[in-house]
Amino acid sequence: MLTFVGLGLYDERSVTVAGRDAIRDADRVFAEFYTSRLIGTDIETLEDTLETSIERRDRAGIEQDPEPILEAAESEHVVFCTAGDTMVSTTHADLRLRAADRGIETRIVHGTTAQTAAGSLTGLQNYRFGKATTLPFEDAHGGDGVPDSVVATIEDNRDRDLHTLVYLDIKVDDPHWEESDDTYMTASQAATMLSEPFPDTLGVVVARAGSPDPLVAADTLDELATQTFGDPLHLLVIPGSLHPLEADTLESVAGAALE
């Protein structure tokens, strides 16, 4: 059996009780942290808290060589973990389908995601979010500025009067990324990049969702580009038009100066 467990947003306490129990009951536990991280903890603390040994896999070990996980799941109870939810944004549907093709039973234990936290913290209504996008570092996509696909996603959402959740690039355990380079894109870096195609546009920063000290800030992208927002992880939201309740919440919790 292969159980997918989302670990939540921040530290070893973010996992649900159901997720914790599944991990403790497993014969083997695998995890990946190349797409997102639990910033408030480390692998050793996770292992101590969850009373298990965690076998960490890199991107190639999940996408190109999943055999160790699948072979173990054919005869043992195996858990595969990620930050957030294993099937939301950081999707591992391919691994689940490979397991199903081999007759391996699968189960999903959901975790809190950045998508739900962004709506909760900002007061932006969840059903008014359109397609999300990820903003990569310029050096990561081999071009200058913002990729056309990111611009198109934001423009399409704005045409439909929808909010856009922008995930910010993470380069952790990436063999193609120099250790001296940034590993976590900051909201100010993202605002700098996006302010060119979207001048005079409102942005909403969400930093450290799920932690004891989350931060929410709203201003124009040009202004956000000049500010700092502390430790990662950061998200950026480009809102559509605001419902009065959304506007009131951003003014109250994010310091937005809305006309």
Swiss-Prot record:
Reactions the enzyme catalyzes: 2-[(3S)-amino-3-carboxypropyl]-L-histidyl-[translation elongation factor 2] + 3 S-adenosyl-L-methionine = diphthine-[translation elongation factor 2] + 3 S-adenosyl-L-homocysteine + 3 H(+)
InterPro entries on file: 4pyrrol_Mease, 4pyrrol_Methylase_sf, 4pyrrole_Mease_sub1, 4pyrrole_Mease_sub2, Dphthn_synthase
Residues the entry annotates as binding S-adenosyl-L-methionine: L9, D85, V88, T113, A114, L168, A209, H234
The organism's place on the tree of life at top rank: Archaea
EC number: 2.1.1.98
The keyword Transferase appears for this protein: yes
Pathway(s) it belongs to: Protein modification; peptidyl-diphthamide biosynthesis
Keyword list, A-Z: Methyltransferase, S-adenosyl-L-methionine, Transferase
Gene Ontology MF, one: diphthine synthase activity
Function: S-adenosyl-L-methionine-dependent methyltransferase that catalyzes the trimethylation of the amino group of the modified target histidine residue in translation elongation factor 2 (EF-2), to form an intermediate called diphthine. The three successive methylation reactions represent the second step of diphthamide biosynthesis.
Family: Belongs to the diphthine synthase family.
Subunit details: Homodimer.
NCBIfam families: dph5
Protein name: Diphthine synthase
